[in-house]
Amino acid sequence: MRIVFKIGSNLLETDEGDIDLSFLSKLAEGIKKLHSFGDKVLIVSSGAVLSGAKKLGIKEKPKDLTLKQALASVGQSYLMHLYDTIFSNYGLKVGQVLLTKDVFSKEKEERFKNAKSTLEKLLELGVVPVINENDAVAVEELVFGDNDFLAVYVSFMVNADLLVIFSSAGGLKDDKDRIIPVVEDIEKVFKYVRGTGTSFGTGGMRSKLEATRLATTLNIPVIITSKEENILDLRNLKTKGTLFKPSKRKLRNALKVIATLEEPKGIIVVDRGAQEALKAGKSLLPAGVVSVQGNFKRGDVVSIQNEEGLIIGKGKVNFSSEEIEKIKGLKTSEVRKLLNTTKDEVIHRDNMVIFL
């Protein structure tokens, strides 16, 4: 079994503002036991900026990107020192892997393959990879959303069987502040989202839910839970937090690539009727298109967004943005006459992945 643990900055910090060494010890002990079952474990760990701030005596979350990157440079080595020291007490070896967003790009496929090969070799050697975004050189500001999405991309890269996201919230809570034990339809629980991140984190529950939605679409189960969780229970999908069940629709690899590695060139906004049709496995027809954002050509990948602003899918378009502007809202028969084409769909269902 392959398990990815995602640890945010807030989980690494105690109430007193120190690095939580006891949690890292508990995690190492749990991973040691998982190894005894033959499981492979990877850690996606935030905390470089937090660790750098602790080392330099900075108490407030930095707003300046250059300062963040400088703190990440100082903090990443200290963070890995902590992992190495604590995990070695349990006979575990760790390996640092720093990634940037362009690793997960179809246009730079060799970087993806190289990163995957490195992670596979580390796992083969019995090493626990500790993965973080390379904040010190990132061009865009912390683009992975407190590493929630990075954890999903890594899970996809290594064909993980489970993604565990540790959260100070302990799981997804309903409107009465009760943890929801199991979620099968993630669209229905977005209404419970609250929080935009902690002092040194950039995520929050919305980021975690959006990342979880992508993971479950990729057929990866996700658990959001607290750091008090029993590590061994997790491998059996038992949790005191929230278990998000994977989608029942099995995606072929080409669609998984669209969902993860293809950078969208634009956005197509659809109405409620089209959203329900897409959820039911139908193609996207011009009649359901409300508007188009960006400039793209035929064959490009775009994001599909509902009228509430939620990204609900991605897919390869049969028409350019200019053509879709002309045919949006029209019936199929009208489209054929206007564009002199035999194609009916803006995006065919075979070239589309829906996150609902």
UniProtKB/Swiss-Prot annotation:
Q: What is its main location?
A: cytoplasm
Every copy of the PUA domain together lies at 265-342
Top-level EC class: transferase
Q: What are the EC numbers?
A: 2.7.2.11
UniProtKB keywords: Amino-acid biosynthesis, ATP-binding, Cytoplasm, Kinase, Nucleotide-binding, Proline biosynthesis, Transferase
The text of the family note is: Belongs to the glutamate 5-kinase family.
Name recorded for this polypeptide: Glutamate 5-kinase
Q: What organism is this sequence from?
A: Aquifex aeolicus (strain VF5)
As recorded in Swiss-Prot or TrEMBL, the protein's gene is named proB
